[in-house]
Amino acid sequence: MTQDVNDAAAFAAATGAGPQAIADLERYRSYLAEWNEKMNLVGPATLDVFWSRHAWDSAQILPLAPDALTWADLGTGAGLPGIVLAIMGKDRPGFHVHLVDSLTKRCRFLNEVVT
């Protein structure tokens, strides 16, 4: 899917994300920017294009398995695509995303994001 998703409004229009999902993604983006200063979670230049590079790229996976309720993001790193999938599926009963990473520091970041 090729689409210009340069901001939260465009992301909402492209995905049908509601206000709470957008607020949760903004919160995630804030955590990502803050923690990225301490450890290299994503390339610094990609923070400026969060909506197209991270949120939209991650959200595009959902339509490929529309009935899937359980997802595993192995080697999740910064939580992509897992955190975005979890936010987008939050209102679906039984929807779960498992985030798996081998580095303790990244797991600390992920725990901070999801709590």
Label every model-predicted segment.
Residues M1-P44, D48:
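N-terminal auxiliary segments of SAM/dcSAM-dependent transferases
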Residues A23, A45, V49-W56, L80, ...:
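Residues at secondary-structure transition points
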Residues E34, K38, F50-L69:
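Conserved alpha-helix/loop element of class I SAM-dependent methyltransferases that forms part
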Residues A59-T115:
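Conserved SAM/SAH cofactor-binding pocket of Class I
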